[in-house]
């Protein structure tokens, strides 16, 4: 859909076939960039939030469900953390969580839409927080698909895909060519991770994504959690590596250093989230 619908009593809804998901609040910004429609809202339940092309992306008071689930299984398990790549993530939340690790020396964020960054910095400053001023962060306002295709082989220790649903500017983040380029630029001992949709609301997209990543990398597993404002609330992130499923085993020293500052992630939570694969998904993947 191109834009969220707003009802007379202040409900702002994301629509899909036969269902809708909404928050009550007011629209602060509704504009169209060269790439997508961007809406910023102030909700009574979750604070200020961001929608792209009418789909919920994030909100102040529940964003950690998403960002901690994407970042910490990868950064707690990769062999090295010197160079990190984030594709998308213009709200700043993924970069913020990555830069909590002192071993990260350089983080490339590649975000195609300048307005997503600018509006997030203005209206949702807590998401990016200190990351925007951290000298380790390099913001590249470029096409992430082209960036990955042109990057040097074995140039990143961790690659995180923080894109929207597979439509519009994010459509190319879900195909085999893109995943093959990610594998090519991942260093030995590295970890790749991407959001991989809802196993309930977008079941076939989720299954196809996990299957394709597993085919390309050799080792890949979905992790399941919840993002309250997303369709069905049930979400997934898929982690991959070339040299074995290292993403399942957080390194104790890193986990101890990072877990105290987390609201959702912990080694125990992560173990359960990987094991929480539904039977119907497991059957499809074996």
Swiss-Prot record:
Keyword line: Cytoplasm, Polyamine biosynthesis, Spermidine biosynthesis, Transferase
Organism field: Prochlorococcus marinus (strain MIT 9313)
Chain ranges of the PABS domain: 9-242
Binding site for S-methyl-5'-thioadenosine: 36, 111, 143-144, 169
Compartments it resides in: Cytoplasm
Free-text function comment from the UniProt entry: Catalyzes the irreversible transfer of a propylamine group from the amino donor S-adenosylmethioninamine (decarboxy-AdoMet) to putrescine (1,4-diaminobutane) to yield spermidine.
PROSITE patterns hit by this protein: PABS_1, PABS_2
Protein's UniProt name: Polyamine aminopropyltransferase
